[in-house]
């Protein structure tokens, strides 16, 4: 992206130095070279399969394809999703890529909170369940039951569970309950408004 705009490679610098440029940071989402996406057929790094075309492509390019088709995205993850050096862009980039929910075995504490701040729904498998035990491989189409966070005031109790169904390409449907990891009434208010920024702006209006 930078090279196409005439930036010399020696001037690329780090993602941290480009954190004010959402175009760069969105492309940096899930770009760690050690990332292992089981949809990428063994390729490490920021790759995935674009089910609109069937091709293995960059996560950013696939996200643009899904956005054009009006398809919101779900991340299936394992334990302690979001672990590592805490960065706000770890939640901002998935939002820009079209991620609307993350279903994981567990979450790193700060990252879970940051997901809520971005309006991304964190869902947790029940103890003893995960993508493998449920037979999920990421090729499914997911339907998450609408979660009612009330009027958007930080006084309503949050729903504790939600029904999820995953339809496989062969027609089989896997249904399970997920724990809603929106842990406080204030977080519920953020989710009701679509994120913390929208919540704050509406409080000022």
Q: What residues fall within each predicted segment?
A:
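Fe-S-dependent hydro-lyases/dehydratases of central metabolism
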Residues: 1-205
């Amino acid at each position: 992206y930078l090279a196409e705009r005439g930036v010399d490679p020696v001037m690329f610098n780090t993602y941290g130095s480009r954190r004010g440029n959402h175009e760069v940071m969105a492309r940096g989402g899930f770009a760690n070279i050690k990332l292992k996406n089981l949809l990428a057929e063994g390729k490490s790094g920021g790759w995935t399969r674009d089910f609109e075309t069937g091709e293995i492509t960059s996560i950013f390019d696939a996200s643009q394809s899904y956005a054009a088709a009006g398809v919101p995205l779900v991340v299936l993850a394992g334990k302690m999703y979001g672990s590592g050096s805490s960065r706000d862009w770890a939640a901002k980039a998935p939002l820009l890529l079209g991620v609307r929910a993350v279903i994981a075995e567990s979450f790193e504490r700060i990252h879970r909170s940051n997901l809520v701040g971005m309006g991304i729904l964190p869902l947790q498998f029940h103890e003893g369940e995960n993508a493998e035990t449920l037979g999920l491989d990421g090729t499914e189409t997911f339907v998450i039951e609408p979660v009612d966070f009330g009027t958007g005031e930080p006084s309503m109790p949050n729903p504790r569970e939600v029904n999820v169904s995953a339809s496989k390409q062969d027609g089989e449907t896997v249904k399970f309950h997920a724990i809603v990891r929106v842990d406080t009434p204030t977080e519920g208010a953020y989710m009701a408004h679509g994120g913390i920024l929208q919540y704050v702006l509406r409080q000022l209006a």
